[in-house]
Amino acid sequence: ELVRTNQAFARFVPDEFLNFLGKESVIDINLGDQVQRQMTILFTDIRNFTSLSEQMTPRENFALINSYLNHMAPVVRQHGGIIDKYIGDSIMALYPDSPVQAIKSALVMRGLLKEYNRGRKRAGYPPLDMGIGIHTGVLMLGIIGEEHRMESTVISDAVNTASRLENLTKLFGVSIIISQAALDADPACRDFCELRYLGAIPLKGRSQGLGVYEVLHPDDSTYEAKIANRELFHNCIAAWEALQDRKQGSRDVFAQYLKVFPEDSALNYYLNRSEYFFLFPDGDKK
């Protein structure tokens, strides 16, 4: 009976969570059990799901979410990750060993999404798109609640940062963004995949900008162009970050890049920022 209880419980709280807390069984868990350790957090989210959801019935909504998660969630486990929770169409996953595992998961997910969309197209449904944010930091894992209702949770600013990186993918028009902190946690990250520096980006709750990178994936139609123009883009960002007066010179910084690779969606972030500084030169740069 205890085995069946643990198996049922594992569908809601992963066995790895019990291991982190030093517990053998769900019945050993107590309110306030906790542990602190460094991990990598991966956040995924379906783009524009709200507008898509409004066009479907409740049954269709849940069918889509469960179908999508059934394709994506196993990828996390196959690469050493733990699914902490589903938040609607979003996945929050933890990787206790290396951010390389999270990068592998993200790239496989992108490939699976392409295959998944082929099936949706054949069925007459619109394609889905997704954003992925990856960050590494110290987490507190533990049990919260009260006597009659307890649940596992993760508390950390690193979780908020990973979620904000996923949101950044929309602003930059890219699929996968990883933080400098994640790359620094394991040097193997830089050897495993192609990266493109996107800048030191101001995030809510941080006094300094966080260095972020795009993880390039071969399925991207602009993959080769991004690699070919990577150094020029990096130089433009460095020049932009060094500007004292972004109202006057910010657009000039990207003028050459616009001529070479105007299709680069990441340009929109900086051009929009340039417009902001033109309209509000004394405003909050965040």
Predicted regions and their residues:
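Regulatory cytosolic signal-relay segments
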Residues: 1-36, 268, 282
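Catalytic NTP-binding/metal-coordinating core of nucleotidyl cyclase/transferase enzymes
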Residues: 1-5, 28-108, 152
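Short, flexible loop/turn motifs enriched in small residues
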Residues: 33-37, 127, 208
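TPR-repeat structural position
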Residues: 58, 99, 245-248, 264
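Alpha-helical scaffold within the catalytic cores of cyclic-nucleotide enzymes
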Residues: 65-81, 92, 96-132, 136, ...
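Cytosolic regulatory/linker segments at or just downstream of nucleotide-handling modules
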Residues: 139, 169-241, 251-283
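Cytochrome P450 core scaffold surrounding the K-helix E-X-X-R motif
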Residues: 143-146
